[in-house]
Amino acid sequence: MSGQGKRLMVMAGGTGGHVFPGLAVAHHLMAQGWQVRWLGTADRMEADLVPKHGIEIDFIRISGLRGKGIKALIAAPLRIFNAWRQARAIMKAYKPDVVLGMGGYVSGPGGLAAWSLGIPVVLHEQNGIAGLTNKWLAKIATKVMQAFPGAFPNAEVVGNPVRTDVLALSLPQQRLAGREGPVRVLVVGGSQGARILNQTMPQVAAKLGDSVTIWHQSGKGSQQSVEQAYAEAGQPQHKVTEFIDDMAAAYAWADVVVCRSGALTVSEIAAAGLPALFVPFQHKDRQQYWNALPLEKAGAAKIIEQPQLSVDAVANTLAGWSRETLLTMAERARAASIPDATERVANEVSRVARA
């Protein structure tokens, strides 16, 4: 499907959970001849990341309102109006055929600016419960898509766009069949690390002994303290790294993952075909719980919420999963994934642009 001469503006910012899926869709459409620009904020990760991917970025000034106090709330209408005006000027100059909102605060004024100019708005909600910005924008959007069922009552479920190297992994029955020895446990707390996992997993390792081998991503600045915790637990043999640059290789190595349940993490684990023990971040919307729930319902994962998290709870769960059980869970995870999510989102953008 050629997009020769068509123009897209992607609105996404703040976190990797918004930016990476946007980049996947952008690259897919650029390969079809689309021109793509990005709308973001200068002080968040998209400012550095997006230009590295060969995409020009325009900035507006906007930030979140939650927990900012009464003065910020009083000033909010003026700040939103100014951001809307900036976004409107950018879009009048660029003249996109369609804008794609992938979440983050930038999508709010950006979506309103597009709507006020008669430019169709396409939305993608990555989480199992809709963010505030997308809830507002859904009322004016031409098309609303969601990664997990339930964020919007009638939106099409298309999954989350996932990195191509994760999608390229061999199927779990090819990867995991015939594996022997200690169960390989990959521990991932997100790029910031998760203090609760850093504190809990060394003690879990002590309980499970040589039945497991662990690769633990500690997050920035925590590697030394986590290595020390494993050593003090009598388990110095496990591997601790601040970051894992090649997540596809880590997924290929693992038999099971212990992690938070950010939207992109859940989608990647399903696409990789891996069983998981999810410890959702305690957010007032329980966003990460709802992200993980479809995989638990599919028999591919278990959720332990943070108040119930203990060394025994994690150790007993991992000890109770035989290799046969892990393979069955891995196959269920893969079956629950939507590997063509990028194409599905891109096709809707193309369809709306042609309408």
Swiss-Prot record:
One protein family per Pfam: Glyco_transf_28
Primary location class: membrane
Residues that span the membrane, as ranges: none
Alphabetical UniProt keywords: Cell cycle, Cell division, Cell inner membrane, Cell membrane, Cell shape, Cell wall biogenesis/degradation, Glycosyltransferase, Membrane, Peptidoglycan synthesis, Transferase
Protein name as catalogued: UDP-N-acetylglucosamine--N-acetylmuramyl-(pentapeptide) pyrophosphoryl-undecaprenol N-acetylglucosamine transferase
Binding-site positions, UDP-N-acetyl-alpha-D-glucosamine: T15, G16, G17, N127, R163, S191, I244, A263, L264, T265, V266, S267, E268, Q288
Reactions catalysed: di-trans,octa-cis-undecaprenyl diphospho-N-acetyl-alpha-D-muramoyl-L-alanyl-D-glutamyl-meso-2,6-diaminopimeloyl-D-alanyl-D-alanine + UDP-N-acetyl-alpha-D-glucosamine = di-trans,octa-cis-undecaprenyl diphospho-[N-acetyl-alpha-D-glucosaminyl-(1->4)]-N-acetyl-alpha-D-muramoyl-L-alanyl-D-glutamyl-meso-2,6-diaminopimeloyl-D-alanyl-D-alanine + UDP + H(+)
Compartments where found: Cell inner membrane
Cross-referenced NCBIfam families: murG (TIGR01133)
Pathway note: Cell wall biogenesis; peptidoglycan biosynthesis
Topology of this chain in the membrane: Peripheral membrane protein
Entry function: Cell wall formation. Catalyzes the transfer of a GlcNAc subunit on undecaprenyl-pyrophosphoryl-MurNAc-pentapeptide (lipid intermediate I) to form undecaprenyl-pyrophosphoryl-MurNAc-(pentapeptide)GlcNAc (lipid intermediate II).
Keyword Cell division (UniProt): yes
InterPro entries: GlcNAc_MurG, Glyco_trans_28_C, GlycoTrans_28_N
Molecular function in Gene Ontology: UDP-N-acetyl-D-glucosamine:N-acetylmuramoyl-L-alanyl-D-glutamyl-meso-2,6-diaminopimelyl-D-alanyl-D-alanine-diphosphoundecaprenol 4-beta-N-acetylglucosaminlytransferase activity; undecaprenyldiphospho-muramoylpentapeptide beta-N-acetylglucosaminyltransferase activity
A GO cellular-component term linked to this record: plasma membrane
Biological process (GO), any one: carbohydrate metabolic process
Record-stated family: Belongs to the glycosyltransferase 28 family. MurG subfamily.
Entry annotated with the keyword Cell division: yes
EC number assigned by the record: 2.4.1.227
